[in-house]
Amino acid sequence: MNAEKSPVNHNVDHEEIAKFEAVASRWWDLEGEFKPLHRINPLRLGYIAERAGGLFGKKVLDVGCGGGILAESMAREGATVTGLDMGFEPLQVAKLHALESGIQVDYVQETVEEHAAKYAGQYDVVTCMEMLEHVPDPQSVVRACAQLVKPGGDVFFSTLNRNGKSWLMAVVGAEYILRMVPKGTHDVKKFIKPAELLGWVDQTSLKERHMTGLHYNPITNTFKLGPGVDVNYMLHTQNK
């Protein structure tokens, strides 16, 4: 497993990276700042595995892997997983946790654009979860993901819709009222409307296959997937 440093790339927001570097040591604390990620991970994993026809024996790339929550769970499903992130500290946490868990994941500090220049068409599945809203040029990430997946392979994106409801739920509610995530985690101006994401997808070799919303019920304190993409949503695409 590696956590290699790489040259600075244009599509990096160092303020965004610093946010996650500051709390990286608590990435695997089930009651800490990343509790929501742990809570929704089974939903994400189930959606990805079902839509991709299983993960066993497949070569998978997790773009913006952070501390490795999704990457590890996909490796447990029998996938050969590479995790990309530009945060050095989150990758160190991911690397150590994988060692402790006996899980093999290859962690690399590199942008997805740099990775695509070297490994085009190498992956059966590419995942990019809650990462697009943290980079200056999300369309560039979509292009790179399309380049990295094999013909017929699957690419999954998740992000936040940009509207008043998502601001109330993801920023006011999650950060300030319920304190589910650290204040300042999200910038509503960087949220992405589904039509925008689909427009970027249409300019690549990817084709939309399915879209679903991720919903939180504060009364029951539960998450579920279902219709409605007005706040969090996931998109399944496939390389033509």
From Swiss-Prot:
Pfam families: Methyltransf_23. It comes from the Bacteria. Transmembrane segments: none annotated. The keyword Cell division does not apply. Its EC number is 2.1.1.222, 2.1.1.64. InterPro entries: SAM-dependent_MTases_sf, UbiG_MeTrfase. One of its GO terms (molecular function) is 2-polyprenyl-6-hydroxyphenol methylase activity. It catalyses: a 3-demethylubiquinol + S-adenosyl-L-methionine = a ubiquinol + S-adenosyl-L-homocysteine + H(+); a 3-(all-trans-polyprenyl)benzene-1,2-diol + S-adenosyl-L-methionine = a 2-methoxy-6-(all-trans-polyprenyl)phenol + S-adenosyl-L-homocysteine + H(+). GO terms for biological process: methylation. Keywords: Methyltransferase, S-adenosyl-L-methionine, Transferase, Ubiquinone biosynthesis. The keyword Isomerase does not apply. Pathway: Cofactor biosynthesis; ubiquinone biosynthesis. S-adenosyl-L-methionine binds at R44, G64, D85, M129. CDD domains: AdoMet_MTases (cd02440). NCBIfam families: UbiG. Belongs to the methyltransferase superfamily. UbiG/COQ3 family. O-methyltransferase that catalyzes the 2 O-methylation steps in the ubiquinone biosynthetic pathway. This is Ubiquinone biosynthesis O-methyltransferase. The gene is ubiG.
